[in-house]
Amino acid sequence: TRECTSTLVLEGRCRLAFKLLRAYQNEFRGVCCTPGALSFYRADYVRSVADEWLSQRFRGQPCTTGEDRAIANLFLRDGWLTAYQENAKVYSKMPATFAGMCRMFLRWARSNIRETVFLFSFLFRRFRGAYLNTFRFNMVLATMSLILPPLLIAGNIGALFASDGYVFHQYLAVMTYALSVAVIYYVNERDSDWVWLMIYEFVWVASLWWIIPYAFATLRNTGWLTRKVEAEPVGRVLRAQPVAC
């Protein structure tokens, strides 16, 4: 929901994750994270892996977050194709404070690291026929994008004092990247949210670069972090029912 600057920045982040990233992954039917907000799965397959999914553990701890990425990994491992429906519309409650936004990004980063480790346990097996090498190549690139940016930023911090004009050059590099993403988005969507995509890139470099390194250092922390109210217990088990599409 559009409540404040934080939620608008987060909307820009979601636009990037869906309109660009998942739309691209859809081209080779390899969406690696089917979003928990709205996804449809084959019920018979979910039943067959339900115990494995629900009892997943990582480094000795039960996995309580990232269940959407986890179920997508199971589908991919067993040869299913995953897709993104571009015209689906979902409304979600986002953190309205910077601290809440950081906690949410930490939760996402920890589960992303965990599920990337799981992904590599089968990535180089012949687990599917269609688009196999394309999927492998893109997952390796995605992993590099998870690891390299924090290392580059850490190196840049050390170089701040070594060269005159270094900050200005780095500012131009970030501006070029942010503008490129915004242009690609605008060409495809033709709306004003490209502005928030640009702002998100600057916010990430300036104040969120530490998220991934800290997530690596605190992988054993499995808390939800942004949930304020305890979920009410479900009185009965809801069985999956077929629906008309």
Each PLM stretch: what is its role?
Residues T1-F127:
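Non-transmembrane catalytic domains and loops of membrane-associated enzymes and transporters
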Residues S6, L38, R42, L172-Y177, ...:
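Transmembrane alpha-helices
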Residues P35, A43, G223-C245:
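Short linear elements at protein peripheries
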Residues L74, C102-M104, N133, V234-G235, ...:
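Short alpha-helix boundary/capping motifs
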Residues G100, M104-R110, E115, W196-R236:
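Membrane-proximal soluble regions of multi-pass membrane proteins
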Residues W108-F122, A130, T143-L160:
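Short hydrophobic alpha-helical module
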Residues F127-M144, L238-C245:
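Loop-to-transmembrane boundary segments
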Residues F137-G223:
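Membrane-embedded multi-pass helical conduit in multi-pass membrane proteins
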